[in-house]
Amino acid sequence: MHGTCLSGLYPVPFTHNAHHYPHFDIYISFGGPKYCITALNTYVIPLLHHILTTPFIYTYVNITEKSPQKSPKHKNILLFNNNT
């Protein structure tokens, strides 16, 4: 059985222009080590870089080593939900 290497809920604001801050909830769930590397390189590092280099934006990042039992069974889940 493969455990989830990276699982987290990212309410991250993305800026489409200087005055708009639409909010998207991104839930990323990866299973297996190869997905872990992909997730880190593709999502986590850019998100952290975006968070650290963008002023006046609050964000909550929760990264767990083990996925909760109630987490989805699917792999490579990337859902965008507009919460504006």
UniProtKB/Swiss-Prot annotation:
A Pfam entry, by short name: DUF468
Family indicated by similarity: Belongs to the UPF0320 family.
Protein name: Putative UPF0320 protein YAL068W-A
Organism: Saccharomyces cerevisiae (strain ATCC 204508 / S288c)
Further remarks about this protein from its record: Contained within a telomeric X element core sequence.
InterPro entries assigned to the protein according to its UniProt record, in alphabetical order: DUF468
